[in-house]
Curated annotation (Swiss-Prot):
GO biological process, one term: translation
Swiss-Prot/TrEMBL keywords: Ribonucleoprotein, Ribosomal protein, RNA-binding, rRNA-binding
GO molecular function, one term: small ribosomal subunit rRNA binding
Recorded family membership: Belongs to the bacterial ribosomal protein bS20 family.
Name of the protein this chain belongs to: Small ribosomal subunit protein bS20
SUPFAM superfamilies, per the entry: Ribosomal protein S20
Organism: Bifidobacterium longum (strain NCC 2705)
Annotated GO CC locations: cytosol; small ribosomal subunit
Amino acid sequence: MANIKSQKKRVLTNEKAHLRNVAVKSGLKTAIRATREAIAAGDKAAAEAAYKVAAQKLDKAAGAGVIHKNQAANRKSGLAVAINAL
């Protein structure tokens, strides 16, 4: 454990941020999985609706610094290509 007061505060802040980031990443995975399942089922309307949610979550995560903006763009692009192939 840290001895310096500011470092003790940073440990708590980092722990909160870590928990928040884990929750955001979990939501991302769920949204992407829902999109991929709709694509696998061949349901274009459901896939597009799920993609809209996933794209929004990806953009928010990138904006918050949870994932890199290029990673968000790559994931959105991959999902869009799969949906357009339906």
